[in-house]
């Protein structure tokens, strides 16, 4: 824990709160330990442009809070700081607007039948989302297919090419595609 109010630098990122360090496979894993509201004020700024309207930031704060609280975590940390879970870039992503969005939605979460939902979100759906049961084994009534409203998104259409060897490595149980 640093007594410096400006935070603790790790590489190019600055963090508040406490840092726990673990050695895993000859690499150092840095885990930032802090309260959820401080965490969220950075997540909101990491997941979306902070110049967007405050109501959009508030919606992101609620979705991100729900998502974070729903995660089970592991014995080292609760949630990954990448797109695997939610992007968390430390203090550099925290702004007055993200702090305001998080404070004004404090404790608000998304529920279905009085339980936290699996509040998944994305930066781009590529035109349409899928029904949950078509992607995962579980059917969530609140995760149903809808068309994307934002055809101007630069990631609306994309492509990725794979070689036969890459597909075989990605899908070894079925010998590729």
Question: What do the predicted segments below correspond to?
Answer:
Residues 1-177:
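Conserved, single-site charged/polar hotspot
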